[in-house]
């Protein structure tokens, strides 16, 4: 192994959130599994138990776990994978100069310090969670997910109150491992979990589960380093990203990705076409199946959990984009369109799709079928090019399913609010209810610098309608490469959208955190308000800008209204007065008068 000797600062953000404790729930079918969650303690005066929330942050928020980035995370799934008896270790391909963009010397990012032999399926076997689910097998991954999705709840003794409109989704009161298996077997959900990513804590993407979010990271030819990208990944999952896509397009793609995967407890996705393009010096016309196939195997051996494949961009669809306002805005879509036009032939991604499936089933890499012809402006939303590609994605889904490969479908894009539901309805019908994974959509084009908001609106809507995972958009969208703070803003924005969608769909546990925070707000438990929020640091900071003293943390007002105009304080006074006089007496008095307010005097009484 050729490791360049140079020092790189390997410091990432660690430590728990305020008032939070990492807990682990054991399995029943698979007692060895330990499912992580976060408990948020509330003040003793509340008389309430801690609030349990979903936790995708991995060991980085666990004080009992020593973080050594150089060693990577514990390989918790390795024994699960090997125990199934259908994989074999092999030497694997060796790193080539082109894998890292021909970087050398000081420009070359060091290789990760530990190399494990990759695993692949034994001859004739499919090692995908879909294959196991179809065979009736409940894997440890499936039970892990069932426990995780229940947010620490035990099986409900009483039917929970359901309030929402699910638009045909069937969210159970309590998620069982068998329900997870059924959803995966049907293709309505996927478990992105490459057998070569044992560090991963299993999660699920599907319409009948909690809405998930993805954060994009990655270097470019202009900026960013390995240390920055690993920290971006850790930072993104700290604030709630469920998956991370490494969209690196500069040098050192292979080595940076290795560092990310070895330290990631969440699924990692990529667009293999980006690295393949780097291998041919950025010349799209020089791409070919052999280079792309080699790149797929390279990334599958590293442990990439899902591939975005733009196989739906077909030669005869390209003319449909000519009259668009913004043409083809997908990087992968534009690369393949350029290749198709130059060679005047069908895309090699489409022509070799069955071979791509064979690679994915040998490592359990899930498909994220790319929307290369998605609209890049609201003027182009729901046009012929977009929906023609969607039809092809539906065909490719059936091909992948026939080979036991897991599939989700990528969606737009830029779509005004009144056209969003049509996207969801068409996707469900065309793609057999495979999970939908959308970028926003952005609902207006007039707000550069605020596209996390324009897209958050669309994300909440399409998540409610049935999208399973939302790809975040940061304030830097269309403007530049996001930094650490942009990543946080994007993640928090999309956590809001996903949670709002869960509430609207009627998820049985979604409102627990809202109600706990509302009670804390009404009772002026300021610290509980901060700690129960999605971003305690910002909430506390905003409060302390005007009321910084510790005494203000118990005050029955904030700087918005002050002590005299606080509606909640006045409500407390009303309640206290009602209790003092007696609720029944007050009710009787109002009933006798028939009015809340004193009636006007009649002419007779005036005399």
Swiss-Prot record:
This protein's pathway: Cofactor biosynthesis; thiamine diphosphate biosynthesis
Q: This protein's superkingdom? A: Bacteria
GO CC aspect terms: cytosol
Q: What molecular functions are annotated in GO for this chain?
A: 4 iron, 4 sulfur cluster binding; carbon-carbon lyase activity; zinc ion binding
Names of required cofactors: [4Fe-4S] cluster
> Could you give the cofactor binding note from the entry?
Binds 1 [4Fe-4S] cluster per subunit. The cluster is coordinated with 3 cysteines and an exchangeable S-adenosyl-L-methionine.
Q: Which InterPro entries does this chain map to?
A: ThiC, ThiC-associated_dom, ThiC/Bza_core_dom, ThiC/BzaA/B
Per the entry, what this protein does is: Catalyzes the synthesis of the hydroxymethylpyrimidine phosphate (HMP-P) moiety of thiamine from aminoimidazole ribotide (AIR) in a radical S-adenosyl-L-methionine (SAM)-dependent reaction.
Q: How does it assemble?
A: Homodimer.
Residues binding Zn(2+): 414, 478
Positions binding [4Fe-4S] cluster in this chain are 558, 561, 566
- The name on file for this protein is Phosphomethylpyrimidine synthase
What's the top EC group for this one?
A: lyase
Any idea which UniProt keywords this protein has?
4Fe-4S, Iron, Iron-sulfur, Lyase, Metal-binding, S-adenosyl-L-methionine, Thiamine biosynthesis, Zinc
Locate the residues binding substrate. Answer: 216, 245, 274, 310, 330-332, 371-374, 410, 437
Q: Give the family from UniProt.
A: Belongs to the ThiC family.
Catalytic activity, EC: 4.1.99.17
Q: Which Gene3D superfamilies match?
A: 6.10.250.620, Radical SAM ThiC family, central domain (3.20.20.540)
**Reactions mediated catalytically:** 5-amino-1-(5-phospho-beta-D-ribosyl)imidazole + S-adenosyl-L-methionine = 4-amino-2-methyl-5-(phosphooxymethyl)pyrimidine + CO + 5'-deoxyadenosine + formate + L-methionine + 3 H(+)
* Gene Ontology annotations of biological process type: thiamine biosynthetic process; thiamine diphosphate biosynthetic process
């Amino acid at each position: 192994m050729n490791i360049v000797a140079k020092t790189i600062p390997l410091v990432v953000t660690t430590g728990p959130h305020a008032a939070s404790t990492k807990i682990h729930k054991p399995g029943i079918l698979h007692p060895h599994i330990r499912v992580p969650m976060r408990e948020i303690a509330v003040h003793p005066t509340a008389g309430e138990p801690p609030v349990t929330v979903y936790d995708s942050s991995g060991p980085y928020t666990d004080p009992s776990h020593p973080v050594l980035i150089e060693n990577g995370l514990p390989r918790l799934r390795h024994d699960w994978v090997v125990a199934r008896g259908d994989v074999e270790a092999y030497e694997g391909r060796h790193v080539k100069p082109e894998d890292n963009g021909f970087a050398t010397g000081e420009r070359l990012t060091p290789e990760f310090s530990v190399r494990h032999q990759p695993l692949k399926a034994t001859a004739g076997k499919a090692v995908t969670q879909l294959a196991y689910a179809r065979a009736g097998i409940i894997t440890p991954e499936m039970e892990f997910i069932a426990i995780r999705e229940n947010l620490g709840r035990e099986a409900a003794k009483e039917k929970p109150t359901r309030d929402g409109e699910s638009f045909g989704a069937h969210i159970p009161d309590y998620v069982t491992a068998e329900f997870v298996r059924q959803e995966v077997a049907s293709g309505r959900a996927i478990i992105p979990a490459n057998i070569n990513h044992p560090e991963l804590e299993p999660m699920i993407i599907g319409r009948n589960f909690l809405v998930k979010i993805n954060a994009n990271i990655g270097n470019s030819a202009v900026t960013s380093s390995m240390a920055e990208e690993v920290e971006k990944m850790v930072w993104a999952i700290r604030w709630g990203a469920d998956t991370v896509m490494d969209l690196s397009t500069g040098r050192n793609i292979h080595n940076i990705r290795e560092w990310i995967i070895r330290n990631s407890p969440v699924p990692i996705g990529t667009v293999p076409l980006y690295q393949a393009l780097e291998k041919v010096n950025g010349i799209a016309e020089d791409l070919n199946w052999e280079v792309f196939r080699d790149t797929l195997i390279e990334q599958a051996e590293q442990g990439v959990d899902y591939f975005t494949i733009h196989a739906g961009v077909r030669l005869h669809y390209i003319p449909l984009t000519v009259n668009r306002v913004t043409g083809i805005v997908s990087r992968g879509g534009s690369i393949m369109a350029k290749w198709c036009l130059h060679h005047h032939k069908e895309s090699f991604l489409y022509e070799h799709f069955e071979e791509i499936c064979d690679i994915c089933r040998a490592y359990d890499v899930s498909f994220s079928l790319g929307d290369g012809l998605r609209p890049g402006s609201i003027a182009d939303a729901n046009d012929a090019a977009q929906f023609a590609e969607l039809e092809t994605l539906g065909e490719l889904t059936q091909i992948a399913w026939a080979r036991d490969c897991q599939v989700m479908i990528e969606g737009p894009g830029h779509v005004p609010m009144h056209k969003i539901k049509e996207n969801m309805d068409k996707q469900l019908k065309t793609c057999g209810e495979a999970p939908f994974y959308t970028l926003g959509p952005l609902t207006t084009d007039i707000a550069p610098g605020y596209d996390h908001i324009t897209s958050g609106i669309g994300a909440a809507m399409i998540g409610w309608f049935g999208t399973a995972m939302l790809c975040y958009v940061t304030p830097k969208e269309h403007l530049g490469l996001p930094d650490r703070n942009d990543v946080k803003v994007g993640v928090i924005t999309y956590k809001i959208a996903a949670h709002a969608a869960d509430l609207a769909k009627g998820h049985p546990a979604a409102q627990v955190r809202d109600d706990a925070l509302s009670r804390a707000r009404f009772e002026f438990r300021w610290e509980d308000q901060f700690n129960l929020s999605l971003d305690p640091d910002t909430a506390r900071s905003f409060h302390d800008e005007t009321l910084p003293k510790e005494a203000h943390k118990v005050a029955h007002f904030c700087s918005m209204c002050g002590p005299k105009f606080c509606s909640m304080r006045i409500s407390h006074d009303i309640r206290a007065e009602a209790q003092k006089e007696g609720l029944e007496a007050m009710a009787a008095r109002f009933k006798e008068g028939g009015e809340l307010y004193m009636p006007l005097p009649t002419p007779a009484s005036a005399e």
